[in-house]
């Protein structure tokens, strides 16, 4: 995918009178030299892995540190008992984000979308729609192409690495990708998709990467939920016609600049933020003594 800006993607779709997913797919095929059948087969495989991660989730599984596991089923049970807010979809999104992020912490197979630390965001917003029959596999794969296209632009213009840009580059990027996937899936115009991405990333600008004990668990697992719910809200706003004052490309550029301004303590080193709290330090010391 050779697009270097969101505006290039939108212009390609407009000039060829094709959907955003088709414009991104054509660009990817031109760069990768793959056949369309092969490319789609690979995307379907990624979607199937996302589904398998959720399907194979074990409520009893715990990470080696003991910091992660068992929370997704708590959310599901609370919703079944009428104790949750936000309705069926939001409860499912929350549970699915936790499931995938917990599986990552427990060394299970996940799809890095775009990173392992943010792997729960994108599948969380799509899996409930697939299960309810609101979206078929082909439509979801088209939405994944759109998500990938925007992710590629973020990678090209800024970064996807927490060590370089903080958590805004991981969960923030994943949230933007999930927002555009939802917007496209629900029939949003290319401009609405770009607005959804801009809102989602803009909302998480400045989010630091501060993993306790250097593990992708606390606060990473729960931040996947924030990224997913943020994506839903931003997609809803964009689909309603709500615009964003700052263009998507400029939001991405701002994220890159903010990342470069963050202290190294707040970029995956486990030296600042929550990792530097008394409890965070105590957890790290305890785990170090046990290893």
Which residue stretches match the model-derived regions?
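Alpha-helical support elements that line or immediately flank enzyme active sites
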Residues: 123-134, 179-187
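Generic N-terminal targeting/processing segments that precede catalytic cores or assembly contacts
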Residues: 1-108, 131-132, 241, 248-291
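Functionally critical mobile loop/hinge segments
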Residues: 184-291
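Glycine- and small hydrophobic-enriched segments that form the cores of compact globular domains
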Residues: 85, 114-119, 131, 135-138, ...
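Active-site-adjacent structural elements in folded domains
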Residues: 107-110, 160-166, 218
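Conserved phosphate/anionic-ligand binding catalytic regions in large, soluble enzymes, centered on
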Residues: 107-125, 169-174
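Acidic-glycine-rich active-site phosphate/pyrophosphate-binding loop
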Residues: 87-104, 139-158, 203-211, 246, ...
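Glycine- and acidic-residue-rich phosphate-binding/metal-coordinating active-site segment common to enzymes
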Residues: 144, 150-163, 167-177, 182
């Amino acid at each position: 995918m050779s697009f270097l800006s969101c505006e290039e993607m939108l212009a390609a779709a407009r000039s060829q009178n094709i959907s955003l997913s088709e414009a991104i797919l054509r660009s990817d095929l031109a760069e990768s030299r793959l056949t369309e059948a092969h490319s789609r087969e690979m995307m379907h495989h990624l979607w199937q892995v996302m589904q398998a991660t959720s399907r194979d989730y074990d409520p009893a599984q715990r990470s080696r540190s003991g910091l992660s596991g068992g929370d997704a089923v708590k959310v599901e049970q609370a919703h079944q008992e009428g104790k949750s807010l936000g309705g069926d979809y939001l409860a499912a999104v929350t549970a699915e984000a936790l499931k995938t992020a917990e599986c990552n912490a427990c060394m299970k197979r996940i799809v890095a979308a775009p990173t392992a630390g943010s792997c729960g965001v994108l599948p969380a917003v799509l899996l409930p729609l697939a299960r309810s029959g609101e979206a078929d596999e082909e439509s979801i794969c088209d939405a994944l192409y759109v998500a990938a296209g925007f992710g590629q632009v973020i990678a090209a213009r800024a970064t996807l690495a927490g060590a370089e840009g903080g958590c805004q580059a991981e969960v923030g990027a994943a949230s933007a990708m999930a927002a555009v996937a939802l917007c496209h899936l629900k029939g949003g115009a290319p401009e609405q998709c770009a607005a959804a991405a801009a809102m989602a990333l803009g909302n998480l600008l400045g989010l630091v990467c501060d993993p306790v004990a250097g593990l992708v668990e606390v606060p990473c697992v729960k931040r996947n939920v924030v990224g997913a719910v943020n994506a839903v809200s931003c997609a809803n706003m964009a689909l309603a016609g709500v615009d964003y004052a700052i263009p998507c490309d400029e939001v991405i550029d701002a994220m890159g600049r903010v990342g470069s301004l963050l202290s190294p303590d707040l970029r995956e080193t486990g030296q600042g933020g929550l990792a530097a709290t008394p409890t965070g330090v105590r957890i790290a010391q305890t785990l170090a003594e046990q290893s």
